[in-house]
UniProtKB/Swiss-Prot annotation:
Keywords: ATP-binding, Cell inner membrane, Cell membrane, Ion transport, Membrane, Nucleotide-binding, Potassium, Potassium transport, Transmembrane, Transmembrane helix, Transport. This is Potassium-transporting ATPase KdpC subunit. One of its GO terms (molecular function) is P-type potassium transmembrane transporter activity. Its main location: membrane. The gene is kdpC. The keyword Cell inner membrane applies. The system is composed of three essential subunits: KdpA, KdpB and KdpC. Part of the high-affinity ATP-driven potassium transport (or Kdp) system, which catalyzes the hydrolysis of ATP coupled with the electrogenic transport of potassium into the cytoplasm. This subunit acts as a catalytic chaperone that increases the ATP-binding affinity of the ATP-hydrolyzing subunit KdpB by the formation of a transient KdpB/KdpC/ATP ternary complex. It comes from Myxococcus xanthus (strain DK1622).
Length: 211
């Protein structure tokens, strides 16, 4: 009986060392060696070297001179500590009213936009933290951004096209644009927008107020 206990104890200790110590250390070491940026959170820095967010977590931009992400049901909006969808079903009256309100707001804020409002701009993602838009949803907002920054529409569209990411491995997912990286590209190309007073006009620059 005692030998059986020792065998079980040795098995338990060896298993804990392998799975609780050696395996995590090996995975962490390989990640830091091969993918240091991704392993540390895919941090994004501005032109002055300041961390302004993560490429994996969306931020809620609202100023006219920046591209806006999808609506978010994560807390008060893009709250990294409260990731969630709206949990509203397709027959929900509340979902219909929310989408209608978003549609009205988008049309009011984008009077020069061509074509119908892209569906993703009136619907939340499952996580509430989606950092991407489709190229079509970004281009739809380009006229507003160009007008707010006082530059030609074609120049803003050039920035959008330069930030389009293709399908992963060429086959997975759809082409997409990272909203934070796109807005940083705008600031590099045309200069940052002047700071807004707290609570007025949304974020003054990418990363301001990021969770």
């Amino acid at each position: 009986m005692f030998s059986t206990f020792l065998t079980a104890l040795r098995t338990c200790v060896v298993t804990m060392v392998l799975t609780g110590l050696l395996y995590p250390l090996a995975v962490t070491g390989l990640a830091q060696l091969l993918f240091p940026g991704e392993a540390n959170g895919s941090w994004v820095k501005d032109g002055r070297g300041r961390v302004v967010g993560s490429a994996l977590i969306g931020q809620g931009f609202t100023r006219a001179g920046y591209f806006h992400p999808r609506p978010s049901a994560a807390g008060a909006g893009y709250d990294g500590a409260a990731s969630s969808g709206s949990n509203l079903g397709p027959t929900s009256l509340k979902l219909k009213e929310r989408a209608a309100a978003e549609l009205e707001r988008l049309r009011r804020e984008n009077p020069d936009a061509a074509g119908p409002v892209p569906a993703e701009l009136v619907t939340t993602s499952a996580s509430g933290l989606d950092p991407h838009l489709s190229p079509e949803a970004a281009r739809w907002q380009a006229a507003r951004v160009a007008r707010a920054r006082g530059v030609a529409l074609e120049r803003v569209l050039d920035v959008v096209d330069a930030r389009v990411e293709g399908r992963t491995f060429g086959v997975l997912g759809e082409p997409r644009v990272n909203v934070l990286l796109l807005n940083l590209a705008l600031d590099r190309r045309f200069g940052p927008l002047p700071d807004a007073a707290p609570g007025v006009g949304g974020r003054a620059s990418p990363g301001q107020g990021a969770p």
